[in-house]
Structures are given as C-alpha cells and as structure tokens.
C-alpha cells in the first residue's frame, strides 16, 4: 500500500460520529447559507484568537483577496510578498488588479526575509503580505514597524499556521487583516473548502461582510463594488466549530510527529546532508507540513517511490515567479536565488496528527536507507 504525506481517513474514523452529527444538525436547521452555524463559528474563531471579528468565506484564496480589498488594495497597487508560497497567495493579488512584488526568503527557515522588504517598497506599494509558511510565523514585529512607518497595510496569509505563535502572539493577530484557509489538509481543515478573515477593525469587518455577499449590505441592494459570492457554507462552518475545539490537540499531535522525525533522522544532518526544519527563535511551530531539504532531492524521492512505495510531496517545486501564468510580471530568473535553490532541494515527509507510529517508522527507516545509500 502506498504511503502518502497526508490522509484524513484515520482522523475521520475517530471523529465520524461528531462530523455526521454536525451535518445532520445543519440539515435539520432549515438554513444552509449564512445561518447560525456560520455565525457561531465566526464568534468562536474570533474568540480563539482574542480578536474582534471573524468573517467566514468560501476558501483561502478568496480570504486573501477579500482581506486585501477590505483594507483598500486595488488595481495598480503594489503588494510585497514571496514567491516561495502556494500560487493562490499570488493569484489573489493578481486577481484584484494589484501587482505582486517579490522578495526572497531566508535560507534557514524559508520565510520572508524581512530585511529585504523595505527596499521593495515604492510609491505604489499599498500592502505587505507575509506568508506564515509550513507552520511557523514571519517576523511580524519588524514588518509592523515598517508598515506603520511607511503607511502600508499588513495582511497575513495564515493558511498554513492555525494555532502557530510568534513571540507569544497567535498567527492572525499581528496585522490589519489575516486570511485563513480551511482546505482539508490544513491544521484546522474542513471536509471541503472554506476560509476566513480575522481583524480587529470594525470598518474592515463591515467591508468584508459586504465583499463576500455581492457588495450588498441589505438583501438585493448592492451598496458598493466590488462584490463577490464568497460565503462559508453552514455545513463546513458547523464541522469547523466541532474541530476548533480540538485544534490544540491537532497541534500537539503534529508536534509529536515532528519530534519523532527529529529522533529518527537528526544524525543524518551532519553525516549525510539532510536538513530538518529549523524552528526560529520566538516561534511555536505547528508543522502544517514537515519540510526537509537535500541537494539530491529528486533522486531520493524517486528511490522512495520506486523502492518503498512512499509518495512524497514538494512544497513547492516551482517558485511562483517562474510559472508561465505569471510571466506578465516580468520577474527575471535568478532574481530570487534562495527561493529558486529551495525549489530544487525541499520535500515533505508524511505529516498529520493521526499518523500511526508504525507508518512513520517505516518512512524514517526508508529515508535513512535511501540517504545513507546515496
């Protein structure tokens, strides 16, 4: 049987009764769109973060898009972000007519290099979008100081960082607005698509509610454009309510899996060139994915697949600026050297809180055999 980096089935077996009860509760309520479950989830997710507002939306991509629009980013504005991210981060910027401006990432933790951001700011820059990648947070203290000094908006992409902290503060609480994805693989994942934006600003929250509902503030009357059909549905909201009560347990489970990898693979770092994740000072990592690094990555992945039936992911094999869909940005190859080097060396080991010990041990043993045999 093939081993994959993620599976929801073991988690579902444990939570089946609660998940099915959530679905039945919604179906029996008589309300499928923007009903009590969405309202309750928004209240509870905001409370978890100690923040004033949460607005549920239909997916993480639109969460980033609506977050940007809600703080006033629009056509021809520039937004500083990274290319070492999932493409939807950049798609969200591009779709509203703004221009992504890329800075490189740090070699040690693969996060936005905040020392490079100010040099990327121009008179057209309106916002910065740091991506809390793989489960740990960018240095938001540095970005907040810069944003305030230069009059810029700060929008966190928290799709991979539910429950993560930096200097004691939760991801999503360190900006003007913060976008979350509840795609099924996430640390807090739905059984389908979902997203949310959190903010402490009343007017931003009002704009978000209008933006997700066609630009309407009352039924059938468009108050202001743009407007979208971007609502979190009741079924996913009710499932997320149930799973939110277990978020800290999910995080603890992921950290335990990460520690087991450290115990089983750490000695290969000095002897055989395998690099394990570095947890930056001040970060409380939630290990959305467990990204390792080796200069012979492609050979390792092939041997694991062909010889051990272990199928691994690469997050991400193509920097966004090198994709043909973003050729119009005109970003030259070689302009982001760390990002481009990482794309040829990083890969992900299986990571989910219900990962069985015997399966993880099989992966560890296989990785050891392959790498020591290179």
UniProtKB/Swiss-Prot annotation:
Family: Belongs to the degT/dnrJ/eryC1 family.
Biological process according to GO: macrolide biosynthetic process; polysaccharide biosynthetic process
Pfam families to which the protein is assigned, alphabetical: DegT_DnrJ_EryC1 (PF01041)
First-tier enzyme category under EC: transferase
UniProt protein name: dTDP-3-amino-3,4,6-trideoxy-alpha-D-glucose transaminase
Functional pathway: Antibiotic biosynthesis
Gene3D superfamilies per record: Aspartate Aminotransferase, domain 1 (3.90.1150.10), Type I PLP-dependent aspartate aminotransferase-like (Major domain) (3.40.640.10)
Enzyme Commission identifier(s): 2.6.1.106
Binding site for pyridoxal 5'-phosphate: 60, 160, 181-186, 214, 221, 229-231, 316
Catalytic reaction(s) noted: dTDP-3-amino-3,4,6-trideoxy-alpha-D-glucose + 2-oxoglutarate = dTDP-3-dehydro-4,6-dideoxy-alpha-D-glucose + L-glutamate
Organism for this UniProt entry: Micromonospora megalomicea subsp. nigra
Modified-residue entries (N6-(pyridoxal phosphate)lysine), positions: 186
Keywords linked to the UniProt accession: Antibiotic biosynthesis, Pyridoxal phosphate, Transferase
GO molecular function: pyridoxal phosphate binding; transaminase activity
Cofactor or coenzyme needed: pyridoxal 5'-phosphate
Stated role: Involved in the biosynthesis of the amino sugar dTDP-L-megosamine which is found in the macrolide antibiotic and antiparasitic megalomicin A.
Gene name linked to the record: megDII
